[in-house]
């Protein structure tokens, strides 16, 4: 064997030895490191009891709170911008709404009435389906309350009271509004003052 062949074999052997030393000195990846697995799982198992303790303590705090406070906090979470209930209309407005729908259901549909009275279509549907009517005592109390807050005292005063809600209703339905008024509020012919007789006829009967 000549000297060149010997040097070539020694060089190959040295390179293989150096490669083995490099492989032994390089650390294993985190996924293949046998010691990394138990430590990672241990960290995960250590977080779980802390979360359970926190949730348990939170539940105990909620149980110690009064029911009204729990309900109030739930409403705050549900309505972060505040509670804004839908608009409520008065009893005369409900009666007017039913009258308009009965007069012309096509013209005064749910969407049109919802736009005119500034309420939701679902509220209009519920009002039309409702058959409840106030008794005389309730109607009297409602009338007194309206008079207290400054409602008009004329026969069609409640129509003017609802002017803001019905200002876009066509004027040709004035007879419908008048017919929907309570019978007690309509002006009877007996309420007009009697005409005074001529003075000549009075003298004739005096004779």
UniProtKB/Swiss-Prot annotation:
Stretches for region Disordered: 1-87, 133-207
Biased segments, Basic and acidic residues type: 58-80, 133-144
Coiled coil location: none
Protein keywords: Mitochondrion, Transit peptide
Annotated transit peptide: 1-17
InterPro entries in the record: NGRN/Rrg9
Compartments, as annotated in UniProt: Mitochondrion
Biased composition (Low complexity): 177-201
GO cellular component: mitochondrion; nucleus
Reported function: Required for respiratory activity and maintenance and expression of the mitochondrial genome.
Protein family per UniProt: Belongs to the RRG9 family.
Protein name as catalogued: Required for respiratory growth protein 9, mitochondrial
Organism: Puccinia graminis f. sp. tritici (strain CRL 75-36-700-3 / race SCCL)
Lineage: Eukaryota, Fungi, Dikarya, Basidiomycota, Pucciniomycotina
């Amino acid at each position: 064997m000549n000297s060149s062949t010997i040097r070539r074999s020694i060089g190959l052997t040295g390179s293989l030895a150096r490669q083995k030393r490099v492989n032994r000195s390089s650390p294993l990846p985190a996924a293949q490191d046998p010691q990394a697995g138990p430590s990672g799982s241990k960290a995960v198992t250590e977080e779980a009891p802390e979360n359970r303790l926190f949730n348990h303590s939170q539940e105990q705090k909620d149980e110690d709170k009064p029911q009204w406070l729990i309900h109030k906090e739930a409403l705050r979470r549900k309505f972060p911008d505040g509670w804004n209930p839908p608009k409520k209309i008065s009893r005369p407005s409900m009666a007017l709404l039913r009258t308009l729908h009965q007069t012309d259901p096509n013209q005064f549909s749910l969407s049109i009435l919802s736009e005119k009275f500034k309420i939701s279509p679902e509220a209009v549907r519920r009002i039309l389906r409702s058959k409840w009517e106030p008794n005389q005592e309730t109607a009297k109390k409602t009338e007194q309350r309206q008079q207290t807050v400054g409602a008009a005292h004329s026969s069609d005063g409640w129509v003017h009271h609802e002017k803001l809600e019905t200002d876009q209703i066509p004027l040709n339905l004035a007879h419908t509004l008048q017919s929907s008024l309570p019978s007690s509020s309509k002006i009877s012919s007996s309420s007009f003052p009697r005409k005074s007789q001529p003075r000549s006829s009075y003298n004739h009967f005096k004779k």
